């Protein structure tokens, strides 16, 4: 383990009991046969050519002033033991305790009962169209929709008021979000309305005992790390020919650590999560684990959205200026703030650069105060439509 960590040839490493390198520790011995005390300091001497390490490392050979940094987590400061070892034995000294500390930083995979999200309320309007399209397609392919709403961090309750289905390519066993879809701009819009990205819903055919597959675990862990611990994944499956079943899950803290530490490896089995190295799984060293070991069930129920309109198509349906023109015609008798109070309508005009970010902010403030939208913005959109 020491040789791998230092990128050295293990056959050219000699360990010693003393700092003067006079009492070598025999090769191929154990802690017991070597008669070493707990936390005993041992000394290492490399008898090979340092040019080998240059080639292996691919960089110039440099003197590491503080090797303890290699054994610390991101942003972590040296422990008292590390400081003491450096003070007593020099800045390059390391002990077994250093390696034990590094090992403890690795994810420990086990069942986790509680999650940050206590309950998830999703509005019927937010996923209604998503459910209808999934039923029409017979759930033959995986699809995803992002959910935006508000989080009560005191109670752990989340309410999703609207959904935005991204441009995506759907397959029988997974989906791929198009790189052209700018989720960050959609998050900016949501923030102007006092909301944030709170989760996603994935539709697929039900599989007994396995609500989420391996790639869903990895994706959920990625989003929970990026958008916060409350991010929740809804799984939408057919209940019968005319209705759907909705379940909610968060992935465990261990899954988030796996994603953050880049421990995930590609898996050929959708029911098994593979690791790049052996990790502790239920107190045993393993290189894989059952997908269900990473799931935390969340209470879910339906509610009503605070957003009045959900008529405009999502980006995933690839709306055009013709859809914009028809939408404005259909709502021309409504107050302008009400017409604009459709999340996917705002997504369309913002992502397609029909309005600037400053104009978007002004629109959202007028919507929240129920004031008429500035005529200059309304006229700009109407002029675009009249050119068709």
Residue ranges with predicted function:
Residues 1-110, 114, 180, 216-221, ...:
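C-terminal functional modules of predominantly eukaryotic multidomain proteins
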Residues 2-3, 37, 131, 187, ...:
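Amphipathic alpha-helical interaction motifs in eukaryotic regulatory proteins
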Residues 8-10, 26, 31, 37-39, ...:
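Eukaryote-biased feature marking scaffold/signaling PDZ-domain proteins and nuclear chromatin regulators
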Residues 112-137:
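Active-site-proximal, Lys/Arg-enriched surface segment
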Residues 144-150, 232-235:
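Short beta-strand scaffold segments in enzyme catalytic cores
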Residues 149-173:
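N-terminal, Lys/Arg-enriched amphipathic/low-complexity engagement segments
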Residues 150-155, 204-206, 236-242:
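Short, flexible beta-strand-to-coil junctions
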Residues 165-218:
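Short HxH-centered metal-ligating active-site micro-motif
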């Amino acid at each position: 383990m020491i040789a791998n960590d230092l990128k050295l040839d293990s056959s050219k490493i000699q360990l010693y009991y003393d700092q003067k390198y006079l009492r070598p520790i025999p090769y191929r011995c154990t802690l017991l046969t070597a008669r070493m005390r707990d936390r005993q300091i041992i000394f290492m001497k490399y008898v090979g050519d340092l040019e080998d390490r240059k080639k292996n490392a691919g960089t110039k050979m440099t003197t590491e002033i503080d090797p303890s940094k290699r054994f610390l987590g991101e942003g972590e400061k040296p422990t008292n033991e590390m400081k003491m070892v450096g003070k007593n034995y020099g800045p390059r000294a390391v002990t077994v305790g250093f390696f034990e500390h590094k090992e403890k930083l690795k994810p420990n995979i086990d069942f986790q009962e509680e999650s940050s999200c206590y309950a998830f309320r999703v509005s019927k309007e937010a996923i209604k169209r998503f459910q209808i399209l999934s039923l029409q397609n017979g759930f033959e392919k995986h699809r995803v929709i992002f959910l935006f709403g508000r989080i009560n961090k005191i109670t752990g309750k989340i309410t999703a008021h609207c959904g935005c289905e991204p441009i995506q390519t759907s397959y029988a066993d997974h989906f791929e979000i198009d790189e052209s879809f700018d989720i960050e701009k959609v998050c900016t819009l949501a923030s102007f309305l006092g909301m944030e990205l709170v989760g996603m819903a994935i539709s697929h055919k039900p599989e007994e005992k396995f609500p989420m597959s391996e790639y869903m675990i990895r994706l959920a862990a990625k989003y929970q790390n990026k958008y916060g611990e409350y991010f929740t994944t809804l799984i939408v499956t057919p209940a019968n020919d005319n209705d759907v079943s909705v379940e909610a899950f968060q992935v465990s803290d261990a899954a988030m650590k796996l994603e953050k530490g880049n421990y995930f490896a590609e898996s050929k089995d959708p029911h098994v999560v593979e690791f790049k190295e052996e990790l502790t799984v239920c107190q045993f060293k393993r290189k894989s684990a059952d997908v269900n070991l990473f799931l935390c069930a969340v209470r879910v129920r339906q509610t009503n959205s605070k957003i009045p309109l959900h008529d405009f198509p999502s980006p995933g349906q690839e709306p055009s200026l013709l859809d914009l023109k028809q939408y404005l015609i259909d709502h021309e008798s409504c107050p302008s703030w009400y017409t604009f109070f459709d999340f996917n309508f705002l997504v369309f005009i913002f992502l397609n650069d029909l309005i600037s970010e400053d104009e978007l902010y002004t629109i959202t403030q007028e919507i929240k105060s129920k004031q008429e939208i500035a005529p200059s913005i309304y006229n700009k959109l109407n002029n675009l439509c009249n050119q068709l």
